[in-house]
């Protein structure tokens, strides 16, 4: 009997060890916040208490750098270290990477519009070696000053904005022009961080997978289905969505991109907690219209496609938001689903 009992205890111990060692399916379980959110709400603690293991800062490199070097920014970094939260920076970057005032020095670094004029409104000319060198040098500067504790770097082009139409660039899609820049930034940043990975943002005009340009090893897919309904699952093919047709069209784009970029490192950046979107990017913020069933369906869909990294905008969730809308059960639901 004693032998049987010892065997039984050993089996129980093995089972318990398996339970303890079992890791969640999703490796990155994130949220992306604007500087004002991070300055006024205790997001390292909120993340820790709700099973979020990665926080992304937002919006522009210069803005985030000012926060990062401030006392509040240093406190944020220390709290993230204390709670074991990884930090990355998801940045609308082009105007900081290629400052618009350089236009007078060399207009060929900037995009050509449909009428053949060089303009400094958005993005750049990816056929300009000088533009790519400038962008790469600036990306390296920000990578050195904005520590990414998971070695992922996000420097986005201008949101859904016009791209270069010069003779050399006009044959390239938005995603291909973006990938040229991303490949160049990766080379520069790896002189500082040998483990660096750079995001290729598939979003809005760059949803189409690149064909003519190939990603260097270390470029990872970041897929952001901006054109979607959040009251319907991402695999819904019935309810109409303007410009794209329906939610499920996003998954077609995702599948095509996963033929180009590794699924193992791919990230989905969705909008489940995005108060700024619900508020139409204008304060005062409205209360988050949380759809828990939709969210859980979405993460199941992404998991079935092999996606192991998910995050969401949670912009406008600052101290004023939490004081105005104290109910936060959706954070527990979010954390529970991505920690399965």
What is each residue range found by the language model?
Residues 1-3:
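N-terminal secretory signal peptides that target proteins for export/translocation
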Residues 30-243, 258-261, 265-302, 307-340:
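Aromatic-lined carbohydrate-binding surfaces of glycoside hydrolases
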Residues 245-255:
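Second-shell residues forming the walls of enzyme active-site clefts
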Residues 15-25:
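Bacterial Sec-dependent signal peptides at the C-terminal "C-region" and cleavage site
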Residues 6-16:
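Sec-dependent N-terminal signal peptides
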